[in-house]
A protein has these predicted regions:
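Serine-esterase "nucleophile elbow" of acetyl-processing enzymes
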Residues: 1-52, 57, 62-71, 75
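Alpha-helical cap/lid subdomain in secreted, periplasmic
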Residues: 31-34, 42, 61-235
Length: 235
């Protein structure tokens, strides 16, 4: 079984450590591979195709090269956090103007739909991850440090960072249901497992090693249940 993990920096394994964004070795595809290796009955190869700062526009552009031409059995698609983000330097320069997310919601959903359709046409099973939760207070502190406090009024007027993140996640869930594809609700898994401060790094959006571990375990559980269901059908 060949699995490609396709997404942005959360797939790549970026975390905010000691004041810097770093790629950590404890990323979710690496730990997922470890979990498969420990379990008898699984012969799985997990490939990390995460790229820092990617959004659904960029994923769509590299879909053929990074996924379809690799001929995996499954593609785990994780995207949305950068789509619903804003160009904070522009917001800081013009806090009284209207600003749109980097990838507007309708285009984001259409991109995800296109990715799913192309994967299915290539005989690849798509599995969509929900958006992991963020920590709005720490994220606001992080972007304010980079872009200035002039964005605070704009954020308050537009409903706050968590408003956009939640909106995109709810819309993604609705689309997944409409498409009838598999979903792994990593957002709920992280919220119910423990304190989010342990799972989200100091920039408020990227995960810690512990957070990536929870992500991996939830994904591994999905494949375990999938395997059990196949065995039951063969009895």
């Amino acid at each position: 079984m060949k699995i490609i993990c396709f997404g942005d920096s959360l797939t790549r394994g970026v975390s905010y450590v000691k004041g810097r964004l770093r790629i950590i070795k404890d990323n979710y595809p690496a730990y997922l591979q470890e979990l498969f290796s420990r379990e008898e009955g699984f012969n799985a190869s997990v490939i990390n195709k995460g790229v820092f700062n990617d959004n659904s526009d960029l994923l769509l552009k590299r879909l053929n090269k990074d996924v379809i031409e690799e001929h995996p059995d499954y593609a785990i698609v994780a995207v949305g956090g950068n789509d619903c983000n804003f160009l904070w330097n522009e917001v800081a320069e013009n806090p009284d103007k209207e600003h749109q997310p980097i990838v507007p919601l309708e285009r984001y959903l259409e991109n995800v739909k296109t990715i799913v359709t192309k994967l299915q046409s290539a005989g690849i099973t798509p599995v969509i991850l929900t958006l992991p939760p963020l920590d709005p207070v720490r994220y606001y502190t992080f972007i304010s440090g980079n872009s200035g406090i002039s964005i605070s009024h704009w954020i308050g007027r537009m409903g706050g960072i968590e408003h956009w993140h939640g909106l995109y996640n709810r819309s993604l869930n609705k689309l997944i249901k409409e498409l009838g594809v598999s979903k792994i609700d990593v957002r709920s898994a992280l919220k119910k497992t423990g304190e989010l401060i342990d799972f989200i790094s100091d920039d408020g959006i990227h995960l810690t090693s512990k957070g990536y571990k929870v992500l991996s375990e939830e994904i591994f559980l999905f494949f375990q249940q999938l395997s059990d269901a196949k065995e039951t059908r063969h009895i």
